Amino acid sequence: MGFYQGPDNRKITGGLKGKHRDKRKYEIGNPSTLTTLSAEDIRIKDRTLGGNFKVRLKYTTTANVLDPATNTAKKVKILEVLETPANKELARRGIIIRGAKIRTEAGLAVVTSRPGQDGVINAVLLKNESQGS
């Protein structure tokens, strides 16, 4: 079932507006993809406008982590989600979003990609905290 993202039929005062047209297909949205840690990677392939596809990462175990000191990237295992600046409740539930601080086998890192939109987790190691847990 889709999520309607068009204008609602309420005025500021709370009264109903007159309906002047039907809902359009382009006003349909999708629920958030709450990427969490799991034993395996699961991706969802959604069709979007124009016949394009969006790959959503539902469950994951690894992240592509860039080490800025050596300018090398490697695929490492994610151990836990430490904090999320957008919402502390997301960190408590273990949901990975852009800007979340995660602990990996390579050390602490900040997620730079949008897992629900890109289908992959890219992260950058934090300076002075590259030691593992």
UniProtKB/Swiss-Prot annotation:
Keyword presence, Ribosomal protein: yes
> Is Mitochondrion set as a keyword in this record?
no
State one Pfam family annotation.
Ribosomal_S8e
Q: Which domain of life is it from?
A: Archaea
Q: Which InterPro entries match?
A: Ribosomal_eS8 (IPR001047), Ribosomal_eS8_CS (IPR018283), Ribosomal_protein_eS8_arc (IPR020919), Ribosomal_Se8/biogenesis_NSA2 (IPR022309)
Q: Per the UniProt entry, what is one GO biological process? A: translation
A single GO CC term, please? ribosome
GO molecular function, one example? structural constituent of ribosome
Segments of this protein annotated with the region Disordered: 1-22
Keywords of this entry: Ribonucleoprotein, Ribosomal protein
| Disulfide bridge map | none
Q: Which family does it belong to?
A: Belongs to the eukaryotic ribosomal protein eS8 family.
Quaternary structure, per UniProt, is: Part of the 30S ribosomal subunit.
Q: What is this protein called?
A: Small ribosomal subunit protein eS8
Which organism does this record belong to?
Saccharolobus islandicus (strain L.S.2.15 / Lassen #1)
Q: What is the lineage of its organism?
A: Archaea, Thermoproteota, Thermoprotei, Sulfolobales, Sulfolobaceae
Gene from which the chain derives = rps8e
